[in-house]
């Protein structure tokens, strides 16, 4: 079974809570919560208040918080207090990586690092033993509905091999253009977690879409 983390950026915001409950009831083990600052990426999404509201309504859910922001260090505590289970930030951010990892862990959250399509996975090497998750972006971050980049598969394979070599325990997540066609390729390459937005919330039957992905 594959872990499915539906990207709620693609949900219907007029019924966000109901959409989240629907995918959780269908078997999604996480909710992928994209935070964008309009600086690190050109788009702006949601922040601490929306997460706090979701957590209030669904306190048992796993909130996979993806910080597509230039300065994640300043938000380690606010997002932890709002209900983040895991805070996942970009290797390409402007803050000190080690300091940010330490700050997130100090708040009691799991920690992940993300790499954009132009970043080699080897750049993560100094931090892999400290991580709970590594996210490989298979599109340029910032907007949903982009086409999957096949080069991400080789990154997943390298990270899977490096994890085995180190006997590390981080999970491998892939995000961007994940659908019924690309998801099996990602799982074969080593992905433990599939982030899917349009493929879930844009499907005629989102619950069935979650179940299909989870069955891979």
Where are the regions that the model predicts?
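Conserved beta-strand segments that form the floor/walls of ligand-binding pockets within enzyme
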Residues: 3, 114, 135-138, 173, ...
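Conserved N-terminal beta1-alpha1 strand-loop-helix module at the mouth
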Residues: 1-88, 94-96, 103-106, 110-111, ...
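Active-site/ligand-binding-proximal alpha/beta "capping" segment
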Residues: 140, 147-193
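Short secondary-structure boundary segments
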Residues: 35, 91, 115-117, 138-139, ...
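Acidic, Mg2+-coordinating phosphoryl-transfer loop and its flanking beta/alpha structural elements
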Residues: 191-196, 201-202
């Amino acid at each position: 079974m594959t872990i499915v983390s539906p990207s709620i950026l693609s949900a219907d915001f007029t019924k966000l809570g109901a959409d989240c409950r629907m995918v959780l009831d269908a078997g999604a083990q996480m909710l992928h919560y994209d935070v964008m600052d309009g600086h690190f990426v050109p788009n702006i999404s949601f922040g601490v208040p929306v997460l706090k509201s979701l957590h209030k309504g669904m306190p048992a859910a796993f909130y996979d918080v993806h910080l597509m922001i230039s300065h994640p260090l300043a938000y380690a505590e606010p997002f932890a207090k709002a209900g983040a289970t895991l805070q996942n930030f970009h290797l390409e951010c402007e803050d000190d990586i080690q300091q940010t990892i330490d700050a997130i862990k100090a708040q009691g959250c799991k920690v992940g690092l993300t790499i954009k399509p132009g970043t080699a996975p080897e750049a993560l090497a100094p931090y892999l033993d400290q991580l709970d998750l590594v996210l490989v972006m298979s599109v340029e971050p910032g907007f949903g509905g982009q086409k999957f980049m096949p080069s991400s598969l080789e990154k997943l394979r390298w990270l899977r091999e490096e994890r085995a070599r180190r006997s590390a325990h981080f999970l491998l997540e892939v995000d961007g253009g994940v659908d019924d066609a690309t998801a099996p390729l990602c799982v074969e390459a080593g992905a433990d977690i599939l982030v899917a937005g349009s493929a879930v919330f844009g499907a005629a039957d989102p619950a069935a879409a979650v179940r299909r992905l989870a069955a891979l």
